Amino acid sequence: IVYSDRNLRFTWSQLNQRVDDMAKGLIAVGVERGTHVGIWAANVPDWLTLLYACAKIGAVYVTVNTNYKQAELEYLCQNSDMHTLCIVNGEKDSDSVQMTYTMLPELKTCERGHLKSERFPYMKNVIYVGQEKHRGMYNTAEILLLGNNVEDDRLTELKSKVDCHDVVNMQY
């Protein structure tokens, strides 16, 4: 995998390891088989990593269009029973961090991973895809670090339960 604009290259082996590490991080924050994970990002390296990580553990990747406005984002998150929303800021003239705070004002006061929202009862996590830190959100480095607490056997167990008939992607 090559991202020439970022001077970044992954061999398939390196990508596989990064995906496993990301999958373990997702498991650490409660994502498992059947969990709905929204990814609101354009073509950045960890979009691919998150997509494959979801697929490996049987989570359902929910496509979030980068052109969505506030009402569309809120409808999607509510209607899809989204558990975790992964965001990248600054895509296509939108401020996804601010839109997320508008949708989930509880993020500003809750502990990461313990979101409780009446409007979005399934939503527990928001992950900022990048190194920036935002109140109430994990960032990529923190997710990868949390994954160190997940045993390889747990990842292997979830991977073994994935079936070719499982839903891998939900699109709106």
Regions found by a protein language model. Give the residues of each.
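Structural core segment of the AMP-binding/adenylate-forming
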Residues: 29, 57-145
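Conserved S/T- and glycine-rich ATP-binding loop of Class I adenylate-forming
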Residues: 37, 54, 85, 167
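Conserved AMP-binding/adenylate-forming core of the ANL superfamily
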Residues: 1-52, 69-74, 141-148, 159-162
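Helix N-cap/beta->alpha junction signal
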Residues: 41-43, 89, 166
